[in-house]
Amino acid sequence: VKTLYYIDTDLYRYYIGRADQSVNEAVMIRRVDQQLLVTRLMIQAYKSDDLKRLDRKLAHCMFNYVTMMMTISTILLTLDGSDAALQKRVDIWRYLKAENPDWYAPIRYGSVATFVNFPGEFGRRLSIGNYRLARRVYKFN
């Protein structure tokens, strides 16, 4: 981008409180495939070699953004709980590991994603409990 123009015009008006809003947990779970698509595109766009050419602060910002996307995708798929959703959860982590191995361990084991990605039935219940606690503390959704 070489030139940017600002136009002081509302292009979209967001009404708070509608049941079908994208921040509604049930709606987010229904639309998780869109979330996964964007997450995959982010992982693909910021591979290790590409990051070396970016400004250090921008690379760190993108790492944090992918971490957030992985965390959200993981908990939404866990909340869904269906066999298909749980397989998608495994698949997105495998995709991250295959496409960007340098990011896999720091995101999986060294970030907030750790607290929503425990294995097994008990681990899934613990992950959902952690999510519900964070939701109460930070007042999101």
Q: What is each residue range found by the language model?
A:
Residues 60-76:
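Amphipathic alpha-helical repeat scaffolds of TPR domains
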Residues 1, 46, 73-80, 137:
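Generic structural signal for hydrophobic core residues of well-folded globular domains
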Residues 4, 73, 99:
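Phosphate/oxyanion-binding loops and surfaces in catalytic or ligand/nucleic-acid-binding neighborhoods
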Residues 56-64, 86-90:
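Short, charged, amphipathic alpha-helical segments
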Residues 79-141:
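Membrane-interface aromatic/basic loop that binds lipid-linked glycans or pyrophosphate carriers
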Residues 34-60, 101-104:
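C-terminal, non-catalytic tails of nucleotide-sugar-dependent glycosyltransferases
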Residues 3-38, 78-87:
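Nucleotide-sugar-dependent glycosyltransferase catalytic core
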